[in-house]
Amino acid sequence: MNNQKYIRNFSIIAHIDHGKSTLADRLIEHCGGLQAREMSQQVLDSMDIEKERGITIKAQTVRLVYKAKDGNTYYLNLMDTPGHVDFAYEVSRSLAACEGSLLVVDSTQGVEAQTLANVYQAIENDHEIVPVLNKIDLPASEPEQVKQQIKDIIGIDASEAVLISAKSGIGIDLVLEAIVNKLPPPKESSSDILKALLVDSWYDPYLGVVILVRIIDGTLRKNIRIKMMATNSVYTVENVGYFTPKKHISDVLHAGEIGFFTASIKQVADCKVGDTITDEKKPCEQALPGFKPNLPVVFCGLYPTDSAEFEHLKDSLAKLRLNDASFEYEMESSSALGVGFRCGFLGLLHLEIIQERLSREFDLDLITTAPSVVYKIHMRDGESLEIHNPADLSDLQKIESMEEPWIKATIMVPDEFLGAVLSLCTEKRGVQLDHSYIANRAKIIYKLPLNEIVYDFYDRLKSCSKGYASFEWQMDVYEPSELVKLGILVNGEEVDALSTIVHRSRAEQRGRALCVRLKDLIPRQQIDIAIQASIGSRIIARETIKALRKDVLSKCYGGDISRKRKLLEKQKAGKKRMRQYGNIEIPQSAFIAALKIGDE
């Protein structure tokens, strides 16, 4: 298949739960990509965790063959993209490989915050956008109102939006006709020299690294020698093919097509997402612009509960890193938890997903330290540092100032919940930038410190709006702030794994909460245990776990008082010695519970 005018590369963009994976299922079913008995819900959500949570995490690709009403056969390459703000990087990669997008909006809920974020990315990529209104068979559906919303908020004419119900299959043929008639084909190939964009890569235990590519110019064939332009690595192509969504071997991919190839690549580092792949013998002169890499914004430590599992954790992280280019890690050690890894994530959902995948796919039992963000530290000697681990915060006397990251958040909420949402944003040190109404929904834009978001903001936002608020954010600026390191001491010894960096106004509240929680979690011992929260050398909160008292007089039935006194003195001396030399063992379960996110 060489004629590019019969190819359409498109992605589906939508907010979570607006039905894009269901629409993808219907398109596959309609085009005969899978037989009826092979169909399952959310075909393209390959991970169990995606199906259980009802979210798309990894962008997936599928080639559909469609016989249009004009009599021609078209080849449609669909990129199913995630909707959650944490996985915007996956969306950006999918959009770069396509020329058009289907904008799916739930006709019962209207435009949501994350719909906006993804649409703006599509517009930046010069996409032709076709609005699709889903769930029109529900009683609460308001298609005319939602069309007006799309026009008012996004600025796209939605008067000819396709009305569908992905669940019951209404209007699927109209969507396919809109893809063929309204979305543009790939640009004509300007050269015969191979130039391909590396869109994604994942690890297959039998084939090694499988690479997903969009061919821009030339052809990719079996047995040719290719070069990765970012790393200058050279490989021989072994298999070439595409997904329907089953794997199909085709031996060649032409310009404009999206497919995969394998080349016995074992090195994870050689597959840089956004890299340009070219022919080793006739390389192209200029690499493709690639993608702007997404930098991690939330960091935490991952430690195995059993130190013998460290090597297993190391291998597991290396394999996950291949499937997830936005996830970073480096080795670190903690006096309380042993050797582990400091990991960087795009957000809290991303952190949870990685944790759950390590647990399910690699059978690892992990301890996760409290999440933190990247702070900029300006020292008195003129040096500037970036730290994300509170344990790295050195002598406070040498620090001139500290800056924390602020985000620009867009929140859309029904007006009856607006008061509760505004109170939450104010409590989190937010600054209101804009406030507008679209029908009965409020759109508010706030500037918020990222430090406040990573704990429990998302859960509390959903809670105070009964699940109706939607939230999207992007990094804004770094600003000076009164930040302090909150340390936790158990019997005078600082526990590095429980240290956090907080705003001075929140330090006492958070310190007290941690002390109370640890008091409930650490088992009583033979001596009193002091749990203290400190800022530098100043103690700001304290809780005491009272000692267990062994009854040494239980065997004295009456008798001389001096005998009893002697036993009590002996016990007192033993406890004094224990206080002097005894180490308090904090059980792993106490750490896990104390570090639980969102229990503040």
UniProtKB/Swiss-Prot annotation:
EC identifiers of the protein: 3.6.5.n1
Membrane topology value: Peripheral membrane protein
Name this polypeptide is given: Elongation factor 4
Primary location class: membrane
Organism of provenance: Rickettsia felis (strain ATCC VR-1525 / URRWXCal2) (Rickettsia azadi)
Enzyme class: hydrolase
Domain tr-type G: start-end pairs: 5-187
Any Pfam family: GTP_EFTU_D2
One Gene Ontology term from the biological process aspect of the record: positive regulation of translation
Family: Belongs to the TRAFAC class translation factor GTPase superfamily. Classic translation factor GTPase family. LepA subfamily.
Keywords for the protein's UniProt record, in alphabetical order: Cell inner membrane, Cell membrane, GTP-binding, Hydrolase, Membrane, Nucleotide-binding, Protein biosynthesis
Protein role: Required for accurate and efficient protein synthesis under certain stress conditions. May act as a fidelity factor of the translation reaction, by catalyzing a one-codon backward translocation of tRNAs on improperly translocated ribosomes. Back-translocation proceeds from a post-translocation (POST) complex to a pre-translocation (PRE) complex, thus giving elongation factor G a second chance to translocate the tRNAs correctly. Binds to ribosomes in a GTP-dependent manner.
